Amino acid sequence: MSDSLLDLLQQTLEREMPICTPMGIKAKTWDGSRLTMQMPLEPNRNHQYSAFAGSLNALCTVVGWGTVFLLLQSQGLTGNIVIRRGRIRYFRPVRAPKFVAASLPVDEEELAYFYELQRSKGKTKIDVSVEIRDEQGPFVTFSGSYVVQD
């Protein structure tokens, strides 16, 4: 989709979540339902030379937040986005020099309800799933519940 939306997201993250800059988190793609973001290993590694679990959690949380941000922007909606709850599972160590986390598309009915509540009440919530994976399967799966309020 629009590079301008990705640019807006990146600028917003750098301004509102400054930890994203030293972590090297970068918005890569947005197709209207799925956001991908990339992060380098080196500033986010642990003593085992694999990605630090806290950095992986932060990346997945930001991808979920960014997905909600872009969904709202795509409909001309705004609001304060916060994570209410997150659940993460680690399956294998991440050792690639750069790796990508991707949100999974939200169910269409759930998305329609999300938009309807924000328009009518100025308050809504949505669950977003995120994965870091390769051709062999997932490294990390994350599910976050996000709340939006005017």
Whereabouts are the PLM-identified features?
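Short structured motifs
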Residues: 21-25, 84-90, 112-115
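Short histidine-centered beta-strand/loop micro-motifs
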Residues: 47-51, 92, 115
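HotDog/MaoC-like acyl-thioester-processing domains
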Residues: 95, 105-150
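A generic structural signal for short beta-strands and their flanking turns/coil linkers
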Residues: 23, 33-35, 77-86, 98, ...
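Hydrophobic beta-strand-centered segment that forms part of the acyl-chain substrate-binding groove
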Residues: 67-101, 105-107
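Extreme N-terminal tail/first-helix region
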Residues: 1-17
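Catalytic strand-loop segment that frames the active site of acyl-thioester-processing enzymes
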Residues: 19-51
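A short mixed-secondary-structure module that forms the rim of ligand-binding clefts
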Residues: 44-71
